[in-house]
Amino acid sequence: SLYAPSAVVISKTQGASADAPAQRAVTLRCLPVGGDHPAPEKACAALREAGGDPAALPRYVEDTGRVCTREYRPVTVSVQGVWDGRRIDHAQTFSNSCELEKQTASVYAF
């Protein structure tokens, strides 16, 4: 096959809109695991556990005890591509980067 069954582009944008220019973006390929994501095995495992649904990621994260400030500096993440042959086009905004990291673990850690 020309295309991996699960390959996505994950991006981060400062602000509350996924339409703003991305500050960072990485590729993540699963089966075979690869891309330029810094922890592709962990990110693929988290997405697999969430059934390929990025919106379901927060419920799978363990409580690390990390405390975040209440500052509002929104960060928007987006995931676009294909997961198990299904098209993914997801965007989600977090109140700040600490909340993003606390709630989503390895997928957006880049």
From Swiss-Prot:
Pfam families membership: SSI
Subunit structure of this chain's protein: Homodimer.
Family matches, as InterPro entries: Prot_inh_I16_SSI, Prot_inh_SSI_I16_CS, Subtilisin_inhibitor, Subtilisin_inhibitor-like_sf
GO cellular component labels: extracellular region
Annotated localization: Secreted
Site, Reactive bond: residue positions: R70, E71
Keywords: Disulfide bond, Protease inhibitor, Secreted, Serine protease inhibitor
Keyword Secreted: yes
Disulfide bonds: C30-C44, C68-C98
The protein's name in its UniProt record: Subtilisin inhibitor-like protein 1
Major place of residence: secreted
GO terms assigned for molecular function: serine-type endopeptidase inhibitor activity
Reported function: Strong inhibitor of subtilisin BPN'.
